[in-house]
Amino acid sequence: MATKFKIKKGDQVMVIAGDDKGKTGEVLQVLPKKEAVIVAGCKMAKKAIKPSEQNKEGGFANAEMPIHISNVKKVEA
C-alpha cells in the first residue's frame, strides 16, 4: 500500500535533521517510492557531467539530492 504524504510539490518546508538543519525551501519534487523530497537549495551535491555532443567539455554541476520525508516539516509561507 502506498504511503500518502501531507507534503506536496510547491510547499514550503524546513529541514529538521542533517547538515541542512534549519534551512527552509520549496519542494521541487516528491519521490513516493523513496519516501523522500527534493528541496530547493538544500542537500547540494556535485554531480559529474560526461562530455557529449551538446557539451564537449563535460565538468561538474551542483544538484539537489533527496531528503527523507521524516527529516522535513511543512511551514506556513
Curated annotation (Swiss-Prot):
GO cellular-component terms in the record? ribonucleoprotein complex; ribosome
Q: Name one GO molecular function term.
A: rRNA binding
Q: Which SMART domains match?
A: KOW
This protein's record includes keyword rRNA-binding: yes
InterPro entries given in the database record: KOW (IPR005824), Rib_uL2_dom2 (IPR014722), Ribosomal_uL24 (IPR003256), Ribosomal_uL24_CS (IPR005825), Ribosomal_uL24_KOW (IPR041988), Translation_prot_SH3-like_sf (IPR008991)
The record ties this protein, via HAMAP family, to: Ribosomal_uL24_B
- Relate the protein's function as given in its record: One of two assembly initiator proteins, it binds directly to the 5'-end of the 23S rRNA, where it nucleates assembly of the 50S subunit. One of the proteins that surrounds the polypeptide exit tunnel on the outside of the subunit.
- The protein here is known as Large ribosomal subunit protein uL24
Q: Which organism is it from?
A: Sulfurovum sp. (strain NBC37-1)
Q: What is the organism lineage in this UniProt record?
A: Bacteria, Pseudomonadati, Campylobacterota, Epsilonproteobacteria, Campylobacterales
Q: Which gene encodes it?
A: rplX
